[in-house]
A protein has these predicted regions:
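Positively charged, amphipathic and often flexible ligand-engagement surfaces
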Residues: 1-377
């Protein structure tokens, strides 16, 4: 990073570390964008450029090339949210297909990614997850969702590109899990193409993993799994509180850490059937995976194991892994500033809620600034 980028990062994480400032800034930004006030340039020059790759695929190329020179791969994520109509779902499908076309034969971009509710309505996913009976029209709409999933995964399969299916809120996750395994049964028979995301801050995810392996219908499947802690903690807890139900999220960070570690144990006990991504900003989790690989005599660049972090976060982890020849990528969101605001707000809220994350980022940035100052003197 340049000195300017380091200073900007320090400034941003200072703001993110204050939950009150995050709430106020978020409200002001939403208001400004809603009424088309001239704030886009300011957002683009600060938080957008720090956490996002650009406004288009081509616009991301300088970042992609810069990362790859340091042995860090990229995953392009068209991160717009809030689609509601069949037209929008079909447009999103076209975009995902075009991204796969754009990245095929690009060594620096080994994965594609998509958010399930970009291909179908959230309400439909919720109803399917609850096991409620569809109307005739809803059955037709759901068949189109399945068809969109299949088209994306088939395109990835045809071009030998791995594809990550994002996890979402607990309300919709059961339907996503079912679609993910349906796609794996079609496209993961010889090698892993489709990867489902498992949020280990949920209390039920170990049971889900065991069910995957033990289900006889999956005997021929090579599983693709991306393990994360989770990105919707505040929202999940708030919804559970409003509904008067038990939260699906682990009670404490320690419980989540234990769950994540048990998930890693599960993966390494079943590596003959699993290819996986350790998508974590937690140094201890990354070190644990490295130790487990060493104990099993797995080479650092084994194609079945990847590490992933978000662009703009945990550069110390990503670049140190790359330096040691591990497979690592950065998720690189792109799109218009306005469309990416839900993603950027979630990043700010997540960093505020994750204990110690912002402090670690600030300390690492300060250490690098100090190192550069010493080199000058």
């Amino acid at each position: 990073k340049s000195n300017f980028e380091l200073t900007r990062a320090y400034f941003l994480f200072k703001i993110i570390g204050n939950s009150t400032v995050v709430k106020i800034t978020t409200s002001i930004t939403k208001f400004a964008l809603k009424f088309n006030l001239p704030v886009t340039f300011l957002i683009k020059a600060t938080v957008f450029d720090h956490f996002c790759g650009g406004v288009s695929e081509e616009d991301c190329n300088p970042v992609i090339n810069k990362l790859f020179k340091n042995n860090v791969h990229s995953v392009l994520d068209f991160s717009t949210e809030g689609f509601n109509s069949e037209y929008e779902f079909n447009e999103c499908l076209k975009k995902k297909i075009s991204i796969i076309e754009f990245i095929k034969n690009k060594e620096e971009i080994p994965f594609a990614v998509f958010k399930p509710t970009c291909l179908g309505s959230t309400e439909l996913f919720i109803k399917k997850s609850l096991g409620k009976k569809f109307s005739e029209n809803e059955e037709l709409m759901w068949s189109r969702v399945i068809n969109r999933f299949e088209k994306v995964c088939k395109k990835a399969h045809e071009n030998n590109i791995k594809i990550l299916i994002d996890a979402e809120e607990a309300d919709v996750q059961k339907a996503i899990d079912d679609l993910a395994i349906l796609m794996m049964r079609k496209f993961n028979l010889l090698k892993p193409i489709v990867f489902n995301t498992v949020q280990m801050y949920r209390k039920d995810r170990l049971a889900y993993l065991n069910e995957l392996i033990n289900n006889k219908s999956n005997d021929k499947v090579v599983f693709g799994l991306k393990l994360v802690r989770g990105a919707y903690m505040e929202k999940e807890r708030q919804l559970a509180c409003e509904r008067g139900i038990e939260s699906p999220i682990c009670e404490t960070k320690n419980d989540t850490d234990n769950n994540f570690n048990l998930g890693l144990d599960f993966v390494f006990n079943n590596l003959e059937r699993i290819s996986f991504v350790c998508a974590s900003h937690n140094e201890n989790s990354v070190l644990k995976v490295m130790d487990m690989m060493k104990n099993k005599n797995i080479s650092s660049n084994d194609s079945s194991i990847w590490f992933g972090q978000l662009y703009g976060m945990s550069d110390n982890i990503s670049f140190n892994l790359a330096k040691r020849n591990y497979n690592v990528f950065k998720i690189l969101p792109f799109g218009s500033v306005k469309n990416l605001m839900p993603y950027l707000i979630r990043r700010a809220e997540e960093n505020t809620s994750v204990s110690g994350q912002t402090g670690r980022e600030l300390q690492l940035i300060q250490n690098e600034k100090n190192r550069r100052s010493k080199l000058k003197s």
